[in-house]
UniProtKB/Swiss-Prot annotation:
Record-level GO cellular component terms: cytoplasm
Protein name in UniProt: Adenylate kinase
Summary of the function given for this chain in its UniProt record: Catalyzes the reversible transfer of the terminal phosphate group between ATP and AMP. Plays an important role in cellular energy homeostasis and in adenine nucleotide metabolism.
Regions annotated as coiled coil: none
UniProt: Zn(2+) binding residues: C125, C128, C145, C148
Subunit and interaction comment: Monomer.
Keywords associated with the record: ATP-binding, Cytoplasm, Kinase, Metal-binding, Nucleotide biosynthesis, Nucleotide-binding, Transferase, Zinc
Length: 215
């Protein structure tokens, strides 16, 4: 099944996608991971992406579509994967429909106040990249990783100022996708404000219902 996870930053769609990729052998395609790989490899696209992200803006369609299409073309099984963070707007959705058929959409619903709390509190270990949260998953020692004792840091785009810009961009560009997919009966909403186990359980129920309809 080809799944698209929609939802604002901090809605937990990336975490759930990784869980499904491990438990159900879905191939997880994260635009965030693709962007970071380009940045780490210091590619021409990576340099461009880095500047855009540090300014708290969304990466433009031309770059995003190319990065995602290139990745999809490397997958052997193109019938069983999750797209996380793509598409973000109608233009990208149209391009995705050109590339793939029978896409099903999971829309992660969560209120903005909880989003800001989740993201502004996020801290990442510089050494092992484990993720913590000063509000919901604090470390035993302040700013020190529980696993490797590495130093924690806050991403520049996780500050409250950057988050406001990111959420404004999301509301402006991505929310119209809800109508786009709803009109074609591909939209499935899920309450992402619950804990991760409940969200996973509800998602499995949705996937099961979709599979029954496809039989």
């Amino acid at each position: 099944m080809k799944l698209v996870f929609l939802g604002p930053p901090g809605s937990g769609k990336g975490t759930i996608a990784k869980i499904l990729s491990n438990e159900l052998n879905y191939y997880h395609i994260s635009t965030g991971d693709l962007f970071r790989t380009n940045i780490e490899n210091d590619t021409p696209l990576g340099k461009e992406i880095k500047q855009i992200v540090e300014n708290g803006q969304l990466v433009p369609d031309s770059i995003t579509i190319k990065v995602v299409e290139d990745k999809i073309n490397t997958i052997d099984n193109r019938d069983n994967f999750i797209l996380d963070g793509f598409p973000r707007n109608i233009n990208q959705a149209i391009e995705l429909d050109r590339l793939l058929e029978n896409i099903k959409i999971i829309n992660f619903l969560i209120n903005e106040k909880l989003l800001v709390k989740r993201l502004s509190g996020r801290r990442i270990c510089q050494s092992c990249c484990k993720i913590f949260n000063i509000y919901t998953l604090p470390t035993k020692e302040k700013e020190i990783c529980d696993f490797c004792q590495g130093i924690l840091y806050q991403r520049k785009d996780d500050t409250k100022e950057s988050l406001k810009i990111r959420l404004q961009e999301y509301n402006l560009q991505t929310k119209p996708l809800i109508n786009f997919y709803s009109n074609s009966n591909r939209l499935n909403n899920i309450d992402a404000s619950k804990n991760i186990n409940e969200v996973q359980k509800n998602l499995m129920e949705i996937i099961s219902k979709i599979e029954k309809k496809l039989v």
